[in-house]
Amino acid sequence: MELTTAAGDPLRNLASVPRWLNDGAVGGAADGGLAGGGSLLGAGAPASNTVRARELPLAGIRVLDLTRVIAGPVATRVLAALGADVLRLDPPALPEMVEAFADTGFDKRSAEADLADATTSARVRELLASADVVVAGYRGGALERFGLSPETLLADRPGLAVVTLNGWGHTGPWREVRGFDSIVQAAAGIADVYGTDPESDQAGPNPGSTWRPGALPVQALDHATGYGCAAAAVTLLGNRRSTGAGGVARLSLARTAEELWSLPSIDDEVLEVASPLRSRLDSSFGALEFVEPPLVDSGAQVRHRHAPPPYGSSALAWA
């Protein structure tokens, strides 16, 4: 499985599942559990139980969202739906795609922050001093150059829950390479398994001249990793309540792909499921129809309370 680049972007040769599982380049694909590196690195006394009496489970929890596109924003959308104060930061020079931002921006606030600017960087560090959770979704090394590695964050605030995600894992030679769902699907053998031959109408690997690679019908690695990140954040917060210590969870699209391959294949008939609960909210993007979160709190459906805000409309401050 060769690593090549085009205009600075990584490309992957289409891989089969055996090649993916035996390839040493993606060191993080098989490292530890789905959320690796979850050992507690901070220190402190048990936290007081101030959240339980609030309306939602994560009310009063402050989350700094340093993520983009799908996986990370899905994670912080879950945390926001559970009541956390989520402030998403984006670089002014690289605006997010409107559709992705609107889809994952419910219940959050949005601000722009140029970490290369000394004044802005200092303000972000002030926010970090009172944050409970940081979710970071940039490639390896991107935030480290601004002094925002998980180790530095925990040293500055020992009770912090830090969740990081990237494309190719946190060890190995690809740890600092950009990775996206579709590319990881191809490299992991998913595109090979889901390939089709129009002439035979058969799915699966096929050497015929009309065979074409396929893909999952959704960005499954992104969404699965996002929900995994949210679960990791909640787990770290739960540990902090009893120990006072923060910690780090590291996830990646590659590790999620490996997790999917480890699950048994099910050939049973797919059962019909009920349509998800849909709602509508007015927003600066127009009227939005959306699926409510797949979350239940004390037997009640968790619903989004606020539409996505205008992009970059919030102050660099907690609510």
Locations of the language-model features?
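Acyl-CoA thioester-binding alpha/beta core of soluble enzymes
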Residues: M1-A93, S121, R125-V133, T152-G169, ...
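Rossmann-like NAD(P)-binding element
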Residues: K108-E144
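Short, solvent-exposed loop/turn segments at the edges of secondary structure
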Residues: E99, G105-K108, R157, V177-G179, ...
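Short, glycine/charged-enriched secondary-structure capping and boundary segments
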Residues: R77-A80, F101-D103, L148-E151, E176-F180, ...
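Short beta-alpha connecting loops at secondary-structure transitions
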Residues: K108, A215-V218
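N-terminal Rossmann-like NAD(P) cofactor-binding subdomain of oxidoreductases
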Residues: D117, A136-G195
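Hydrophobic alpha-helical scaffolding
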Residues: D114, V133, P173, V177-F180, ...
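PLP-dependent aminotransferase-like
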Residues: V78-A116
